[in-house]
Regions:
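Double-stranded RNA-binding/processing signature
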Residues: 1-229
């Protein structure tokens, strides 16, 4: 399967991969038993992700207090960050969705693709053990961690960057919206005065604003990794 090629992990029990990609809406429509959807695997994957990310942060930030480690872990395992990681694998393309979820843009919904990402971690764990699951998490979630942490609350981070340097706050402007009411896409712009800092798209205005802020932060980084405006 193409997804196996993307992840570099070959399933011994291919049914686990199918299970991980089966949304409850599809299982309900096709009268598949509860254990046939990905919710139980999501539960398991969540635990594997938390342990792996905790160990990673514990080793990477050896002098950091518990409270700060907890905040950093939250920024890694939160829905927006997992959805970002899922999109890097185009995970939404491989989901089995019910007709209703399909029609309302489920393949692009953060909650659905982030849950599928956790289910996939759970499937790798059951199929290949903790070592393989840990390697998967390190490769697709803990990579480029500094940028992914910025995504956790990009609007707050961006505001903190400009605070104290400028009298104006960052503001967000709706550029356009597309699609039917049940599946809209919003396009937002982050501005400082009249200067465009970044643009973003999402299924809600809030999500689009976060994306715009995230793009702005990445754009404001110079080659040395310092933030500058």
């Amino acid at each position: 399967m193409e997804l196996e090629a993307k992840t570099g992990y070959k399933f011994q029990n291919f049914d686990l991969l199918i299970n991980a990609m089966t949304h409850s809406s599809y299982a309900n429509e096709h009268r598949i038993s509860y254990v046939g959807n990905n919710e139980r695997l999501e539960f398991l994957g969540d635990a594997v992700l938390e342990l792996t990310s905790s160990e990673f942060l514990f080793e990477k930030y050896s002098q950091m207090p518990e409270g700060e480690l907890t905040k950093k872990r939250a920024s890694i395992v939160c829905e927006p960050t997992l959805a970002l990681c899922a999109r890097e694998l185009s995970l939404g393309e491989y989901l089995l969705l019910g007709k209703g979820e399909e029609a309302t843009g489920g393949r692009r919904r953060d909650s659905i693709v982030s849950d599928a990402m956790e289910a996939l971690i759970g499937a790798v764990y059951l199929d290949g053990g903790f070592a393989n699951a840990k390697e998967f998490v390190q490769k697709f979630i803990l990579n480029d961690i500094e940028n992914k942490q910025l995504f956790y609350d990009s609007k707050t981070t961006l505001q903190e960057i400009v605070q104290g340097r400028y009298e104006e706050d960052v503001r967000y402007v709706l550029l356009k919206e597309e699609g039917p009411d049940h599946n809209k896409s919003f396009y937002m712009q982050a501005l400082l005065g009249e200067k465009v800092l970044g643009e973003g798209c999402g299924h809600t205005k809030k999500a689009a604003e976060q994306q715009a802020a995230y793009c702005a932060i990445k754009k404001l980084k110079n080659d040395k990794g310092d933030l500058c405006i």
